Every structure is written in structure tokens, then in C-alpha cells.
């Protein structure tokens, strides 16, 4: 609820302010081309296709290909990143303090600006969240889920995919070294499941 409230307030405050022709305009143009049935990279110059399909999906659902519909789609992605970020912060906090959580949420949102950075920062937070999820309890499902997040991250940016792979491999090595008796899943099987998740996430 806090995430949705703050993202809505920030959107009402800044949602109709400013326009970056190169960054935001490039994304807007790409999303419109996707709505016309074109494919990013193949049919028009673009970054990785994930962000265009995300924006185009919501623009289609809204029945609007305007700039405000694009910004709403980006704000929704921002909300996901802020929610996961707050979850990680709260998980690491010894005491749940509403003022601390509120301050953390505001800092997270300010850190994400300008608007075209929402994707990149949110994806980084999601990758960190998936690794926390894996470290907390390295089960088969969590290995696969961690790989799935890396694969999806690569759809939004090859650099994010690369960072996710490096972070995941480092985490799996650490889990292998610090393996506890309760962790019955072998390293090889965990790597296989993670790899399957990466392929599945990147497949679209």
C-alpha cells in the first residue's frame, strides 16, 4: 500500500512535467512501433525489446498510445522496484519503524530519477531481490526463479543480464562453499535449474 501511495503521489507531482526527446522519446517511439506489429531491433533501431513490450502492453490495455500512458506503464514498473527494495530493507531491519521505512521509500524513489532510469534501477533491485530470495532458502524453485529473473533482466538490457549472471554465479559459489546440512540440493543441480530459468526468462 505504501509503495502504491508514494508512486501515485510522485506521479501526480511529476507525471506531466518535462520531456526528454532522446531518452523518453526513443522509448515512446519504440512502444508505438510495437503497437503497430513491428519487432524491436529487427524492424527499428532500439535497445533490448523488454521495455518496449512492457510499455506497449499497458498502452494497448489503456487504449492510448500517448506519452501519459507510457509514463503510467513506467511508473508501474517503478512501483515493482520500490516494493522489492522496501521488502529487502524491511527484511534486514531488526525493528520495523514506519518513519525509517517511509524515508527509505522516498530515497529509493528519488534515486530512480530521472524517469527513463526507472527500468534500469528497478531491474537491478529485482536481481538483488532474487539473489536474497535464493540465499535465504536455496531450494530448487528458488534456483529456477533466480535464473528466470536474470533471463528477464537480459530482455530489458544485456548489461543487466551480464551483471545478473556474474552476481548469480558468485552467489552459487558462495552457497556451495557455505553449504549447510539443511541444504540438500546439490550445486550441479542448482546450476542446471538456474540455467533453465535463464533460458526460460530470455526465451520471449
What positions do the PLM features span?
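Extracytoplasmic catalytic/substrate-binding loops of multi-pass membrane glycan-assembly enzymes
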Residues: 15-30, 41-57, 64-68
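Hydrophobic alpha-helical membrane-interfacial segments at the cytosolic entry of transmembrane helices
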Residues: 1-7, 183-204
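Aromatic- and kink-enriched transmembrane "portal" helix at the membrane-lumen/periplasm boundary
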Residues: 67, 71, 102-125, 151, ...
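Short, aromatic-rich membrane-interface segments at the entry and exit
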Residues: 19-20, 97-100, 116-124, 141-142, ...
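Membrane-interface alpha helices of multi-pass inner-membrane proteins
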Residues: 108-109, 143-158, 164-169, 198-201
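Transmembrane-helix motifs of polytopic, lipid-linked glycan transferases
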Residues: 72-95, 133
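Hydrophobic core segments of transmembrane alpha-helices in multi-pass, intramembrane catalytic enzymes
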Residues: 27, 78-82, 120-132, 145, ...
Amino acid at each position: 500500500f505504501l509503495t502504491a501511495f508514494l508512486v501515485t503521489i510522485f506521479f501526480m507531482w511529476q507525471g506531466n512535467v518535462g520531456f526528454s526527446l532522446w531518452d523518453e522519446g526513443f522509448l515512446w517511439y519504440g512502444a508505438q512501433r510495437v503497437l503497430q506489429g513491428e519487432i524491436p531491433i529487427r524492424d527499428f533501431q532500439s535497445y533490448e525489446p523488454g521495455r518496449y513490450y512492457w510499455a506497449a502492453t499497458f498502452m494497448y490495455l489503456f487504449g492510448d498510445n500517448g506519452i501519459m500512458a507510457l509514463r503510467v506503464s513506467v511508473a508501474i514498473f517503478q512501483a515493482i522496484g520500490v516494493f522489492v527494495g522496501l521488502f529487502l530493507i524491511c527484511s534486514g531491519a531488526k525493528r520495523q519503524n514506519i518513519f525509517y521505512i517511509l524515508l527509505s521509500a522516498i530515497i529509493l524513489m528519488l534515486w530512480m530519477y530521472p524517469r527513463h532510469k526507472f527500468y534500469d534501477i528497478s531491474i537491478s533491485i529485482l536481481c538483488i531481490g532474487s539473489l536474497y530470495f535464493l540465499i535465504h532458502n536455496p531450494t530448487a524453485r528458488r534456483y529456477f526463479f533466480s535464473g528466470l529473473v536474470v533471463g528477464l533482466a537480459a530482455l530489458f538490457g544485456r548489461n543487466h543480464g551480464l551483471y545478473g549472471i556474474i552476481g548469480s554465479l558468485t552467489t552459487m559459489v558462495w552457497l556451495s562453499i557455505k553449504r549447510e546440512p539443511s541444504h540438500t540440493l546439490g550445486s550441479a543441480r542448482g546450476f542446471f535449474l538456474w540455467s533453465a530459468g535463464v533460458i526460460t526468462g530470455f526465451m520471449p
